[in-house]
């Protein structure tokens, strides 16, 4: 069983990923989590497996209030929960721009053409404003 009671998650800097989320999944029940990029899907999953902690509210998994789980108890809780995340295959020491540019550079495109193509691709997927960020600063769906 998984239950969220008025759960919020706010990151350093004030960015709020979740705001007062409440739901319950019974034992054996299946659910699909969908939403736009930055909606908080990955954050919600990270709370369930204790990769992160809620800023407010309660997360209950199999009857255990995760707010009360010590660092030493985290592995035992995780052994009873399975989560599959998206696999990005990104280089974390390079910016979003550099990650998109790398195969074009390897393929021999001119720097001007690389820039044109990278910016067109980022624009198409709504990430133009994120080109100078590193992958760790992106939400799971970005």
Where are these regions (language model features)?
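The feature captures the beta-strand-to-loop junction immediately N-terminal to the Walker
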Residues: 34-36
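Helix-to-loop junction immediately C-terminal to a conserved catalytic motif
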Residues: 49
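Conserved ABC ATPase "signature" region
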Residues: 64-65, 105, 112-130
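Conserved ABC ATPase signature
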Residues: 134-142
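ABC ATPase NBD coupling module
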Residues: 66-82, 108-111, 115
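Conserved ABC transporter NBD signature motif
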Residues: 57-65
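Short coil-to-helix segment of the ABC ATPase nucleotide-binding domain corresponding to the Q-loop/switch region
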Residues: 93-103
